[in-house]
């Protein structure tokens, strides 16, 4: 051992067991080593020893492991495997809320005394499903999974042994193991989210837990739910490894608890559950009141358990009993028996001097006997009397008071024990009936048995419990030793025999022929047998060699004996051994019970007799086999088996079962006696580690090679211990073989370990002796320290050299600057002289130039003024000339304009007079015509002619329109020519202006003449105004007369308008019909039929009931010619032939309409052929059109199946084929859902979107149809009210069906998308390293080809997946809201599953992985933004914040507080899990323990706050570390948006579809639509 100064070690401590210490002095004087240790509490301790390497020297401290290993998940990986190291590792993990730790093959489970439901969720079950032990952190489920996989793969039965002292958590652990087996899935579907629903068998198996706990568990000083019996549950599997049943074996029920409970303890839970949960009427029937009123329930004091609702537990127990097949009547009978037991406990026996008496009229006795259905007198008799049967007679004697009490309690214990066994037998009958028994292929047994017990007073129960633990410990030691041997043989290494403590002498002491149990049975069979006489026999027989090594008697007293168990010596008090071992009830009481009228009690007693007969037969068989080996007479004596012998026999059977299976061990530890949450008592845990054999396991491991490393792990960790020339090549090699790695391993070992016995190289691993890893770690630490020092030295040398060079350069630079300054000063002086000379020359030149420029400016100004004066004179002359021209032009135009206005006015007056005379004549004529009766006929005739004339005019107008179009073109040409002419005119205008200027002078002369004429004209104008006033008066008079005549004319017109309106309506109808004929004939030539939205009249003569026609659609079949549709080719009729064509169509209608309807009815009625064609040809034989970035699909290419179905459905409704339509639709709905269910692979996305679009189309049609029925009165025509209601009901039901179909296929499709995405997401988001230069290095590059798995998916695959969804939805016309719902759901799913995977991967929680994760998630965010999903980032918050957590500092409390603010979406439990599992790189400092404890304390406080309901902030608290992914059922996003508009339907049948009947239906519908149009 190395105890250099600074070495960390462990020193014994009275209160803590062990305390950390550090060597502060190591001196060697006088042949002795003197060590001084500084303990963690600052105490200084001195140690003197002669040899520091003497492992057996108890005074030496034990070496401590490096900090990185102190909280290891497997204790066998500790460098120093010693008691304090194991204790400290468990304590460190416990303080970080990790209750599970491996110790080789053993799982150590430390009871948290707190609710940790998050550790046992369905998500956690699925996380461990299919994983090898060691892949994830230690857990109960890892052991269960290992057992399940070994059973499945090796076809070998398994056993899980759960042991520990009372209150350690055995029962809970066993319960969760059972839940795991009932919930785990197959390996190939282990990654799929498990459905919560379990099979009925699995539910029944889990239901056994509350039953067994109610009848077999009780509150003790150490545990509120202590199992007072042992249980071995066999979970049975068939050949397909499916759970088919279970079997339960129980061991040593603590019968004495029924009649006696120590202070603060309780009786079995079932009694308190009855008091709290039974209805008042039932309690009255059973004469029950309160728990405190019954002696069997009130001895312990408080009858309540904090945090437990007995009424709620009662309901759980009753439900479980019902589930396992125990009827309500039988349950009532059981409750009557339990109530009777309580009344028996209250029976008051009267005490006399020598005996006891009990009256048959005692109230409690009467109640008990009434409930049990037995005779009260006989029962009371045998309570106070006993009967001894001799060969010749029966002797009845009285019992004293204490014996009577024992007799009374014995009956109660007998009945309760029999009831417990009967319950177990009934459960086994239900869970393992003959049909199940025939299918059993393998089983997994879960043994929940008491741990080693030692109290101040240890009795028969403790003796049996410790005996069982001795047997289990022996098997455990042998199993561990066997596994060690198998590992060494498998790896082909040299090894020597490992010695371990064998407890066989202790077992022989108990179970040999003259052992404790044998002597106990012998004494129990004697009528006068007593505890004292049995004790003397023990002393005489066993307190001598060789048994005195494990047996001894106490120094004082004769009422105890001491057994040296493997854990420690236990002193047993002999009081009550004989009575408990006998476990008998008097024959008199037995006869009384057998005469009961309670059927359930009779069944219980019969079951007891059957069990006794089986035991006797087994003993007879054993004796016969023994007799065959030893000849001689065989004498059999019928003896009632004792409790000890039965327990021994069942224990032997149990050990045989365990030895025939592969065993797994779970050791439960109780961390403190006060049951305080998360409190750790070192001494208490240490005693349990010794008692449960964990330290013995470690000792066995230490004797061999406890530390094992794979070649890869060893090379990656310790390659730096050899010169880089030896390992440099292996890193650079492209192809690295295993031989290369092993050669590096050998070079490392040769360079570091001189003693070859300290290690062995196996086939796949390197095995090290204890302490070697610490030695290698120290070498590695020293090497890294030296390397760091060397690096620092080089860096510092470079730094100071750089500083020297900078100073030297600065000095040179300063010198250069000074020299430069002096030279510049001298040059400056010279330059100043030169500048002065230059300034003088410049000044003189400037003065001369200024004089010259002044003279030049004066001359220039004089010239400017002269030129200005000349120009102003010229402009004035021009202005006067222009004014004269303007005046001349005005004067010349005045006289001709005045003359024109007078002439125009006169003309208007003359026209008005002439028109008045004409109107008067017309009015007289109209009055005459109005009186004529024949005038109307003539008007009508003229109007008809006018219609014809207008029709001809319309044609001429069309012709004129064409001519006008041509005329426009000609005009456009003319416009262009006009533009050219305009240019010419502009030129001419300029020339004309010149002429005008010449003319101005002439006009000035005429101006004066015009002014004179103007005055005379004004006088003439005044005369004309007077004349105009006279004419206005005459006009007003004519106007009044005209009004009267117009009123008469208006009356005449009204009559005319009525006729015109009637005639116009008729003409419009004729015109619209002609246009319809023309349109239909045109459409027929194109293969298209369009019908109006309004329905047709129902076919009452064909239909069974009234129905409305939904044949309001446009049928288009681009692949069918007019001949295929059986339509005669017609040209579009001209206006002149309209009447003739319409008449011909009318004649054909009567002939063909009936034939078409009959054929349609025949095709639609035969649903078998139609259904087969639609389902197989259309629905199953569908083809999805290609969708992509550049592909634009029309709606008919996408929803053609829906359009075809709508046509067929519409025609069925038209003919009243409601039953056929229901059958047809049922087949359609089932087929579509089945098609979507079978989608997989690359077809999943496009085909799923395709069917979503079609189902939406169908649903929209049905909604449109329903709305039309309810809102339009025309649909009621031809139907009775009942038929109408029936029809509304049919369509409403169909709407619900299509709504359900949309919901179902959306959920099926989305779940399939999630399943497909799950395969890619974890690899792409979590595992792939897309960011170059930041490889996390979980595996080295040069070993990847040998050990690492290649990545299957990258982020490109994820983005391709989402792109495929986007383009398919866009191409198939899916609403944007649906796309948004689908993608956000998938993003949330990716966030959840990736986070759940990441939080369970310890080696992925590093800062480099944080960078990679951040990069991958950022790519998803960018995709969301580019596709309009602004809230996509919110769906990935857990991954985003986890990436941040892995990259930021976590070394101070302030860092943690900041981190909590950043990672607001993560719960405290998730933060604690991530931080505690953070993988520290070699160049990082480990996260301090106080920080880990601080984070754990936050979780504890949050949990306490949540459980107490005092969360003032209202925050939701979740202790689960997993995010529950949303796996359905999902809300159908289509239900949240409006249905599609449905004006017309376009049915498109692709050419590749083979649908002859469907095409014929479309053909006939087309013909009918054409005829209906005519």
UniProtKB/Swiss-Prot annotation:
SMART domains: DIL, IQ, MYSc. Its main location: other. Pfam families: DIL, Myosin_head. One of its GO terms (biological process) is vesicle-mediated transport. Gene3D superfamilies: 1.10.10.820, 1.20.5.190, 1.20.58.530, 6.20.240.20, Kinesin motor domain, Myosin VI head, motor domain, U50 subdomain. The modification N-acetylserine is found at residue 2. Residues 933-1088 form a coiled coil. Changing residue 1307 to D: Causes a vacuole inheritance defect. Changing residue 1274 to M: Intragenic suppressor of MYO2-2. Residues 4-57 form the Myosin N-terminal SH3-like domain. Residues 784-806, 807-831, 832-855, 856-879, 880-902, 903-932 form the IQ domain. The modification Phosphoserine is found at residue 1121. It is found in: Bud neck; Bud tip. The myosin motor domain binds to actin. The IQ domains provide the interaction surface for the myosin light chain MLC1. This is Myosin-2. It comes from Saccharomyces cerevisiae (strain ATCC 204508 / S288c). The gene is MYO2.
């Amino acid at each position: 051992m190395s105890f250099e100064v600074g070495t960390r070690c462990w020193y014994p401590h009275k209160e803590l067991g062990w305390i950390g210490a550090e060597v502060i002095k190591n001196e060697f004087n006088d042949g002795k080593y003197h060590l001084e240790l500084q303990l963690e509490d600052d105490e200084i301790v001195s140690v003197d020893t002669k040899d520091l390497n003497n492992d057996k020297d108890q005074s030496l401290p034990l070496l401590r492991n490096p900090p990185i290993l102190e909280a290891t998940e497997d204790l066998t990986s500790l460098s120093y495997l010693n008691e304090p190291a194991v204790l400290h590792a468990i304590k460190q993990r416990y303080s970080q809320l990790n209750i599970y730790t491996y110790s080789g093959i053993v799982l150590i489970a430390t009871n948290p005394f707190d609710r940790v439901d998050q550790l046992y969720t369905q998500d956690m079950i699925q996380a461990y499903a299919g994983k090898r032990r060691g892949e994830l952190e230690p857990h109960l489920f890892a052991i269960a999974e290992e057992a399940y996989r070994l059973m499945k793969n090796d076809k070998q039965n398994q056993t899980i042994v759960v042991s520990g002292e009372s209150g350690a958590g055995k029962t809970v652990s066993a319960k969760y193991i059972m839940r795991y087996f009932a919930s785990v899935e197959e390996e190939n579907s282990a990654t799929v989210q498990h459905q919560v629903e379990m099979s009925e068998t699995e539910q029944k198996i889990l239901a056994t837990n509350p039953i067994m706990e109610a009848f077999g568990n009780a509150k003790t000083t150490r545990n509120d739910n202590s199992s007072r019996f042992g249980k071995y549950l066999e979970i049975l599997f068939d050949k397909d490894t499916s759970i088919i049943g279970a079997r339960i074996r129980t061991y040593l029920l603590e019968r004495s608890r029924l009649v006696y409970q120590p202070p603060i303890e309780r009786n079995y839970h079932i009694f308190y559950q009855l008091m709290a949960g039974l209805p008042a009427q039932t309690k009255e029937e059973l004469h029950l009141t309160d728990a405190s009123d019954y002696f069997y329930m009130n001895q312990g004091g408080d009858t309540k358990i904090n945090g437990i609702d007995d009424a709620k537990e009662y309901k759980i127990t009753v439900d479980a009993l019902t589930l396992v097949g125990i009827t309500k009547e039988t349950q009532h009978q059981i409750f009557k028996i339990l109530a009777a037991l309580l009344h028996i406990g209250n029976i008051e026996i009267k005490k006399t001097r020598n005996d006891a008496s009990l009256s048959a009229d005692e109230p409690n006795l009467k109640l008990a006997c009434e409930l049990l259905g037995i005779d009260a007198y006989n029962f009371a008799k045998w309570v106070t009397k006993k009967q001894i049967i001799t060969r010749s007679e029966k002797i009845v004697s009285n019992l004293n008071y204490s014996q009577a009490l024992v007799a009374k309690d014995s009956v109660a214990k007998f009945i309760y024990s029999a009831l417990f066994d009967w319950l177990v037998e009934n459960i086994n009958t239900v869970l393992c009936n003959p049909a199940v028994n025939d299918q059993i292929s393998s089983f997994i047994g879960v043994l929940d048995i008491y741990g080693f017990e030692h109290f101040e007073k240890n009795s028969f129960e403790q003796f049996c419990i410790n005996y069982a633990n001795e047997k289990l410990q022996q098997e455990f030691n042998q199993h561990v030793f066997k596994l060690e041997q198998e590992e060494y043989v498998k790896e082909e290494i040299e090894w020597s025999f490992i010695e371990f403590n064998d407890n066989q002498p202790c077992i022989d002491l108990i179970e040999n022929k003259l052992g404790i149990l044998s002597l106990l049975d012998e004494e129990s069979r004697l009528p006068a047998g007593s505890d004292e006489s049995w004790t003397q026999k023990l002393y005489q027989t066993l307190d001598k060699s060789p048994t005195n090594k494990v047996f001894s008697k106490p120094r004082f007293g004769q009422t105890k004996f001491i057994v040296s168990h493997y854990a420690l010596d236990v002193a047993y008090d002999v009081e009550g051994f004989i009575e408990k071992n006998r476990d008998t009830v008097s024959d008199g009481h037995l006869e009384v019970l057998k005469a009961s009228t309670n059927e359930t009690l009779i069944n219980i007693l019969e079951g007891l007799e059957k069990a006794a007969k089986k035991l006797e037969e087994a003993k007879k068989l054993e004796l016969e086999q023994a007799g065959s080996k030893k000849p001689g007479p065989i004498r059999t004596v019928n003896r009632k088996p004792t409790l000890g012998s039965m327990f021994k026999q069942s224990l032997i059977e149990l050990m045989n079962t365990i030895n025939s299976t592969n065993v797994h061990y779970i050791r439960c530890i109780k961390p403190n006696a006060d049951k305080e949450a998360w409190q750790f008592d070192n001494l208490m845990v240490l005693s349990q580690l010794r008692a449960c054999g964990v330290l013995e396991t470690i000792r066995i491991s230490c004797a061999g090679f406890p530390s094992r490393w794979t070649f890869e792990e060893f090379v990656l960790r310790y390659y730096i211990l050899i010169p880089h020339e030896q390992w440099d090549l292996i890193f650079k090699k492209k192809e690295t073989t295993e031989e290369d790695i092993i050669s590096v391993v050998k070079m490392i070992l040769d360079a570091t370990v001189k003693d070859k016995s300290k290690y062995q190289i196996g086939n796949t691993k390197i095995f090290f002796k204890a302490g070697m890893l610490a030695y290698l770690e120290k070498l590695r630490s020293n090497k890294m320290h030296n390397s760091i020092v060397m690096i620092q030295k080089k860096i510092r040398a470079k730094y100071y050299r750089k500083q020297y060079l900078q100073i030297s350069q600065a000095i040179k630079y300063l010198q250069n600057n000074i020299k430069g300054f002096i030279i510049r000063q001298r040059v400056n002086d010279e330059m100043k002289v030169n500048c002065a000379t230059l300034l003088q020359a410049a000044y003189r030149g400037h003065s001369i130039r200024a004089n010259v420029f002044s003279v030049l400016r004066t001359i220039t100004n004089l010239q400017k003024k002269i030129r200005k004066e000349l120009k102003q004179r010229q402009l004035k002359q021009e202005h006067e000339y222009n004014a004269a021209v303007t005046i001349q032009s005005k004067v010349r135009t005045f006289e001709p304009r005045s003359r024109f206005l007078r002439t125009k006015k006169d003309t208007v007056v003359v026209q008005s007079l002439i028109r008045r005379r004409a109107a008067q004549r017309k009015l007289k004529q109209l009055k005459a015509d109005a009186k004529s009766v024949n005038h109307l006929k003539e008007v009508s005739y003229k109007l008809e002619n006018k219609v014809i004339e207008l029709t001809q005019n319309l044609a001429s107008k069309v012709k004129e329109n064409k001519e006008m179009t041509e005329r426009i073109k000609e005009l456009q040409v003319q416009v262009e020519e006009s533009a050219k002419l305009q240019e010419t005119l502009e030129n001419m205008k300029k020339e004309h202006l010149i002429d005008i200027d010449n003319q101005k002078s002439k006009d000035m002369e005429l101006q004066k003449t015009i002014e004179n004429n103007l005055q005379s004209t004004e006088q003439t104008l005044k005369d004309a105004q007077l004349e105009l006033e006279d004419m206005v008066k005459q006009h007003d008079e004519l106007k009044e007369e005209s009004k009267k005549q117009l009123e008469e004319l208006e009356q005449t017109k009204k009559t005319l308008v009525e006729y015109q309106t009637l005639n116009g309506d008729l003409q419009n109808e004729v015109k619209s019909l002609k246009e319809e004929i023309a349109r239909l004939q045109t459409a027929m030539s194109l293969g298209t039929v369009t019908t109006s939205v309004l329905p047709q009249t129902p076919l009452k003569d064909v239909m069974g009931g009234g129905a409305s026609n939904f044949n309001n659609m446009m049928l288009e079949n681009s692949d069918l010619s007019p001949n295929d549709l059986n339509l005669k080719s017609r040209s579009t009729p001209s206006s002149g032939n309209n009447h003739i064509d319409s008449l011909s169509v009318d004649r054909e209608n009567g002939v063909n309409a009936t034939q078409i309807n009959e054929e349609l009815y025949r095709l639609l009625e035969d649903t078998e052929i139609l259904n087969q064609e639609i389902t197989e040809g259309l629905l199953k034989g569908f083809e999805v059109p290609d969708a992509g970035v550049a592909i634009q699909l029309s709606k008919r290419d996408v929803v053609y199946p829906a359009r075809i179905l709508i046509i067929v459905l519409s025609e069925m409704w038209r003919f009243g084929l409601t039953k056929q339509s229901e059958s047809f639709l049922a087949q359609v709905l089932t087929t579509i859902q089945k098609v979507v269910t079978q989608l997989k692979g690359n077809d999943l996305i496009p085909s799923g979107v395709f069917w979503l679009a079609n189902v939406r189309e169908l649903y929209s049609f049905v909604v449109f149809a329903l709305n039309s029925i309810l809102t339009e009165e025309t649909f009621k025509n031809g139907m009775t009210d009942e038929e109408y209601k029936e029809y509304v009901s049919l369509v409403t039901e169909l709407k619900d069906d299509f709504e359900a179909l949309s919901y179902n296929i959306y959920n099926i499709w989305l779940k399939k998308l999630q399943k497909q995405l799950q395969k890619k997401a974890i690899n792409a988001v979590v595992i792939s390293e897309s960011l170059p230069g930041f490889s996390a290095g979980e595996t080295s590059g040069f070993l990847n080809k040998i050990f690492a798995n290649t990545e299957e998916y990258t982020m490109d695959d994820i983005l391709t997946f989402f792109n495929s969804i986007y383009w398919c939805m866009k191409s198939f016309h899916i609403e944007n809201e649906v796309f948004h719902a689908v993608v956000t759901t998938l993003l949330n799913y990716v966030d959840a599953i990736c986070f759940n995977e990441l939080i369970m991967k310890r080696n992925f929680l590093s800062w480099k992985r944080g960078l990679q994760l951040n990069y991958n998630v950022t790519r998803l965010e960018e995709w969301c933004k580019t596709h309009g999903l602004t809230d996509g980032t919110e769906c990935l918050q857990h991954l985003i914040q986890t990436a941040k957590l892995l990259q930021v500092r976590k070394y101070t409390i302030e860092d943690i507080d900041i981190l909590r603010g950043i990672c607001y979406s993560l719960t405290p439990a998730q933060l604690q899990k991530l931080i505690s599992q953070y993988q520290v790189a070699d160049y990082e400092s480990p996260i301090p323990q106080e920080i880990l404890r601080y984070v754990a304390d936050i979780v504890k406080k949050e949990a306490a706050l949540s459980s107490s309901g005092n969360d003032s902030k209202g925050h939701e608290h979740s202790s689960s570390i997993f995010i529950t992914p949303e796996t359905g059922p999902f809300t159908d996003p289509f239900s949240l948006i409006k249905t599609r508009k449905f004006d017309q339907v376009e049915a498109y049948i692709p050419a590749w579809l083979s649908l002859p009947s469907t095409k014929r239906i479309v053909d006939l519908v087309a013909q009918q639509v054409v005829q209906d149009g005519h």
